[in-house]
Amino acid sequence: MPCNEIEVGRRYALLLILLSLAASANAHADEAKNLAQSIPELSALEPDLEALYKDLHAHPELAFHETRTAETLAKRVRALGFEVTAGVGGTGIVALMHNGPGPVVMLRTELDALPIEEKTGLSFASKAKGVNAEGTVVPVAHACGHDLHMTGWYGTAEIMSRRRNAWHGTLMLVAQPAEETNRGAAAMLADGLFTRFQKPDFALSMHDEPSLPSGVVGFHAGFFRASLDSVDVTIYGRGGHGAKPQMTVDPIVIAARAILGIQTIVSRETDPLSPAVVTIGAIHGGTVSNIIPDEVRMLMTVRSYDHRVRERILASIKRQLDAEAAAADAPSLPSIKIEPGAESVYNDPELTARLVAALRRGLGPDSAVEMPAKMTSEDFSAYGRAGVRAVLLHIGAVNPAALASGTKLPDLHSPLWYPELEPTLRSLVAAEVVMLTELLVAPSF
């Protein structure tokens, strides 16, 4: 076939794909608008929820510094009749509403924002500053949607408090600090989240999603988010004059050889059916062109689902670094510091299926769609690792037409990211109410 005909064919196929995506996205968006009608209280709440969202968006706070944010939410849920305990795990909140016998169901949101300068141009854009862990003053913005999550969490709390005749058991609301540093969930658990308070039977959380049309729930049973390890490596050499390399042991050359070897760990030592990522994100070494330095520092991130894959990758990194140092006759083996982050998120398959069925019954057959797993991390995993049946779901947050256009859109952690507030917020609240109502049922005798 001539090249021009092939190109025409490709363009035609691409057009069909985009038209199909647009039609599907618009169908999802129409359904998202209709689903909120099944919860009539939402319409009356919308002005207050929008005001809360804009307030939270304009006043972001960094991990473990979310004092204003926590106070705002605690005051609101306390007014709804929840028993509120503040300061759990630092700035975290636990709010309980007991409503007769039944299961304990936890709904978690995140409090913290990111050290990013917002560039959205919104009238309520953040101009906030904060102090990071190194003591540096940095701009702060909600570039990951935690402001949306908190607003939906509160809206859900308000509707559930009004609908006590529709559910039974204990609703446990958790507002967690420091998700962005992967330390908040562990801090709350260490402070007695599941011992000072009731250990839940189920735990739920939702996150905004830039790959789905606004208002559509995304789900994935089984492994959904990857574990995280940060690896800090220092390679030692023997510095000297750049014109006399024979008198030195060059750590830059050792690092270069190690980098190439490390990149084969995933491609040649890991089962292709077991997802894994090794990224070397930073290299620091040397000062000027004619001096060979004494050392080079490298920073890596390692992601995987399976703990056995994780352990093998970390062991392989050490093996390759040690081997390259020995081959170069380095004065000492590299220093390797591994900082474990979040464990992998595992969505309980049976619970996922139950929640998806409830969403499709209550909000329509297209209200929930399956989505791929991700290699990003989330410390929501800590609650599942503590023995609670847990599910993390996503909520589409991008205008369907923009998504179907094929143009590159801002992603999470971008200074340009913000969700399409409606119908995303309405759908977020509706989905959480439907799922909580599904799980909070009276025991049968």
Each PLM stretch: what is its role?
Residues 12-23:
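Bacterial N-terminal signal peptides
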Residues 30-32, 253-445:
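Metal-dependent amide/peptide-bond hydrolase catalytic core
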Residues 56, 95, 107, 146, ...:
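Divalent metal-coordination and catalytic microenvironments
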